[in-house]
C-alpha cells in the first residue's frame, strides 16, 4: 500500500511540475475589432483569443495576450517580441515578405459604413470618376491599403487613417469624414452602437484571416497548423466562430 501511495504521490508531483513548467506563448493583438477581439472588463475576449487559447492548449502551451497598436503587430512578431499575432489579420503578399502565416481560419469582408442620409449608396459611388469623399480607415489595415490605391492614389478622394476602428467611426458620427471602410463584423457592432449609421449592401473586398509568426519560426507555424486542423475537424473552431457570428 505504501508503495502504491508513494507511486501515486510521485506521479501527482510529476504532473504538477509539468503543468507548472508549461511554456507560455505570447499572442499580440489590437483589441478594438469586435467580435474578433475586444476588451470586456479587464480581459481581451472574442473569436481570436478563444481560438488562440484552444490552439495553445492543444499544443501544450499557456497563453498570454498583449493588447497593442495594430501598426506595431507585424514588426513586433517579426522581431521576436511576440510569438504570434491574431488580430483579424489579413493575408497579403506584402505581409508575406515580413512574416509567415498560418493556414486560414476565417474569412473577412470589407464593407463601407455611411450615415443613413449619405449620398454614397454603393461602392461604385465611392470609386466613380469625379468622386471626392474623405474615407476613414484603421491605419495599417488592408482597408487602408485598398483605399489608398483605389481612392487617394487614383485622385478620387482622401483617406484618413485612425489608430483604431472606433475612432474612425466617431469621426464619421461627428461629420469629419464621409464613410468608413472596415471589416463587416466590427462594422455591425459599430452601427448597432451608433444611431444614424448603416452598412452599404455592396461588398468592398473579401479576404482571408490567419495568425502570423516570425519568418524563421517554422516549427511553431507547423505545430499551430496541426492544432488548427484538428480543432477545425472536431468542430471546436467552427463552434467558436458560430458563438460570435451566428449563421444567418
Report each predicted region and the residues it spans.
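Extracytoplasmic small-molecule ligand-binding "clamshell" domains
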Residues: 23-88
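A ligand-binding cleft/hinge motif common to bilobed small-molecule-binding domains
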Residues: 72, 89-97, 145-149, 171-174, ...
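Flexible hinge/capping segments at coil-to-helix
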Residues: 114-134
